[in-house]
Amino acid sequence: YGWQATQESGSGRRGFVKGLKQLFGSKVAIFTLDPESARRRGVQSDFAVKIPYNQVMVEDIAALADELNLHATAVESSYLIVNKYGRDWLSVLLHQDPKDIKDFADQIGAHPESISALHRKLKRLEKFDFLQEKVIEDAVFKIMEFIDKGIHIVLEFGQQSSFLCYMLVANILTRRIHDLYVMKSERYLAAGRTQDKPKQLIITIEEAHKFLNPMAARQTIFGTIAREMRKYFVSLLIIDQRPSSIDDEIMSQVGTRITSLLSDEKDIAAVLTGVSNASWLRSVLASLDSKQQALLMGHAVPMPVVIRTRDYDGVFYTAMGHVEGEELAQKAHANIADLFGDR
């Protein structure tokens, strides 16, 4: 989405399409977890994201329990490490020699087998280059700086594309952004000054059921945001191919839904939760063109309506104001003339 993406052509072959940065220029910033991959692909990133170990909370690890195959007792043991070492808990744990785990567990009053399992599973995090002991610049403060300027941000993962990486980073960054938004919102509500009002923020997540299934929704920051219903000026745009896996309470909070063709009965039922005329809409959903139509319903429209999606091609680029080649040169010349006059 940031710089360039692949897209299937009508013949089934894959071609390249422009990303948001190419179309909207300075209105979009690309933050990357993998600057080397970005450079190899010619991506013009704006910031390389590094996350210090002391920003990883136990809650972030708890949300990864399924991906890490972590037992609940191992997660609970994390709090015993936090009680002794505070924010340095993860760094201290990862630096333990496996031979010393029993002594370490005795020091904090934990079961050796639980600490051993926790240590073994969390060692996987060391393969992520963006996790470091110390960082020069705080990625979340940088994100907030861009947001305050009204600049949209695409977080690019590069070759760090595992679900474990995606869920870890999404949880950490979103949790901290939400914390800052709560502070900004409370300051605005207390003083009532227009200049303190936070910019409305929409956070987009793919594979949303990973964060918002019944178990994860109680543990991740995304469940909190969904239940708050924009209370702190933060909303979620959730994208998923398996809506039936998303917690029912969360689905009931989704105000506007854009739904393409669905064939699974459970997914159809989930999307139509709380919607009037569900039986009629069920037949509409089942008859949509798989690539060109979507059903739009909810707060954004007075009644459900089927829309035809636009092709993402050169015609669309032009409609968005994108120009290149000779036309770009002419536009640049015209802008210079407007600024300095013809010479």
Listing of model-derived features with the role each one plays in the protein:
Residues 1-224, 290-300:
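P-loop NTPase motor domains
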Residues 7-12, 170, 204, 226, ...:
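RecA-like P-loop NTPase motor core of helicase/translocase proteins
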Residues 39, 164, 255, 305, ...:
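Intrinsically disordered, low-complexity acidic/polar segments
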Residues 50, 54, 132, 212, ...:
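Generic, ordered loop/turn and secondary-structure boundary motif
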Residues 55-59, 75-78, 178-182, 226-231, ...:
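Glycine-rich loops and low-complexity Gly/Arg-rich segments
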Residues 59-73, 96-100, 232-255, 273-280, ...:
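Repeat-unit-sized solenoid/scaffold elements
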Residues 226-308:
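Conserved ATP-driven motor cores of ASCE-family P-loop NTPases powering translocation/secretion/packaging/pilus
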Residues 291-343:
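Conserved P-loop NTPase motor module
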